[in-house]
Amino acid sequence: ICLALPLPGDEVQQNWTHFVRIGAYGLSPTNANAITVDARASNVFGIEVDNDIPGRYESFLEPTEKLAAIRRVAQKTHEAGNKAFVYIAGTECITANADKAAHSVVKDHPDWLQRKITGEPAVFTGGAAFWIREGDEDVWISPYATPWRKIYMERVRQIAATGIDGIYVDIPYWMTHFDGWEDTWASFDDFTVAAFRASTGLDARNDLKLGNFTDPSFRKWIDFRIATFTDFMREIRENARKVNPSIMVIPEIYPGIEQEAVRVGADVYELYAVVDAIAHEY
């Protein structure tokens, strides 16, 4: 019997995302060391930190303070022999106290917003979801909003450059999961409609029988919506790895194979090829 054994230098390093025991922490400018100490004490390997840059309008515009905090936690984590990854939103963006603020996404960039076919924008206030506080503005942005996407990918590169081990992208979806939006098959904003026309020659506002899976044009809309977020996640990883070749990109996708995958436009079977791991929330 002949056994082929690997030589000492031939070991393949296992992907750390495959065997982590994670803990989640809110990251501030001053608590990086405390996070690392607590993670060690509780046998955490794989520290998730909440310090969302693109999903909060203030830091989307000015990320310096949060980037410094991410850099500190990455350094402390590595000194302890651990790994850390940071949460960012997909297409959602919240402006704190928008009812009193001079600037918000809606006030500054209403054309960026996802929309129903009726034109209603994806804008929500306190009570629409548990994480949206009274006075805050919560919006969902079209991934085809070119100026937004350019800044978003710049923020991804800046985050990756901190040395953090991973980026956790929360639900990169079309807005079809809040009350009143489930059957909209959004988005019908100008950016998205133009991209669909360029891809298929069809007018999304007039050529589709929404919800009718026997309609060939609607099926093209379904495929287009899924391809959109597959390409979005691919671009996130490409941008992150330009500055940090070993960084991991991990989207959170709660649908599996059920109908919600088609509605929100995130198909895990398409995404596996363009990300490093997928987090499921059930």
Go through the PLM ranges and name each one.
Residues 16-32, 137-151:
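Active-site mouth loops of central-metabolism enzymes
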Residues 18-24, 47-49, 84-87, 167-169, ...:
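Hydrophobic faces of well-ordered beta-strands that scaffold small-molecule active sites
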Residues 25-27, 52-54, 89-91, 172-174, ...:
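Active-site beta-loop-alpha junctions enriched in small/polar residues
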Residues 27-56, 159-166:
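Catalytic domains of carbohydrate-active enzymes, especially glycoside hydrolases
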Residues 29-36, 70, 258-269:
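Alpha-helical scaffolding within the catalytic cores
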Residues 35-43, 72-81, 268-273:
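Acidic (Asp/Glu)-rich catalytic clusters
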Residues 50-90, 94-95, 104-105, 240:
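Aromatic-lined substrate-binding rim segments of carbohydrate-active enzymes
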Residues 118-282:
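Polysaccharide-binding and catalytic clefts of secreted carbohydrate-active enzymes
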